[in-house]
Amino acid sequence: MKKVILLLIALVSIIRAGAQDEEKPVKNIFQGTRFINLQSANVDSKNELQMFIQHRFGNINGGFYEFFGLDEASMRLGFEYGITDNFTVGIGRSTYMKTYDSFLKYRILTQNSSMPLTVTATVAGSFPSIKDVIPEAFSDFSEKASGNVQLHIAKSWNKVGFQVSPGYIGTGYIPVENNSYSFFTLAAGGSVKLSKKVSVNVEYLYRFEEEIDYVNPLSASIDLDTGGHLFQIVISNSQQMFDQAIITNPTGDWSEGSLYLGFNLVRGFNFKQY
């Protein structure tokens, strides 16, 4: 609970901050539309397509025998498209549980000289298509599908960005828990630009659910903007890359050195000229 109170205090500080606002709208507070694993307040521009190739290797504490995680990789391939400058849709497919995911994302407010914050809403869902793993009692679509709603509230101070994201998730059936849950969440993240093309990020999510055995997800990354690509080098206690698994199944633990290295490779395509 102390962590939640600190996050709420940070949000109040953002709103009351006296830092000088930009004269022009601040549309991209962070380098990408995903913070690290979770969504950021950014959206794609109209007619912009982004392709995501996300890789997380196995646990680094497997040592040389597991080649520090390279033998047990998990992957997600995703696509996002900007319907308008404020509305993005996305789909993806992960190797974990052969899971398909999708989301809708709408930017409600944009930071500018008269508006201190950017506010974006996300509605996401996922569905595991793996066979012979989920019990018959949970085989219906409604039992297996998950849904996650988040509100992303972000603020930029030149080279520094901060975001809090309250949310609510219905997990669907979770094999490792042999159960399903519905609960509130609160995520927070910060980003610092070291240069025009390099930034560092940290994100954390708190679950208002005590029955799930795993720790809360905590991730860090270094972002490299090469022009046509965004390359993120990631270290996290969560190996998976869609909301349900990120939130409920972070199998690593920072305190034990049980972590997953990986990367996000994002390639953008602009169709405005066609």
Region spans (language model):
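Short hydrophobic/aromatic segments of transmembrane alpha-helices and their interfaces
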Residues: 181, 213-214
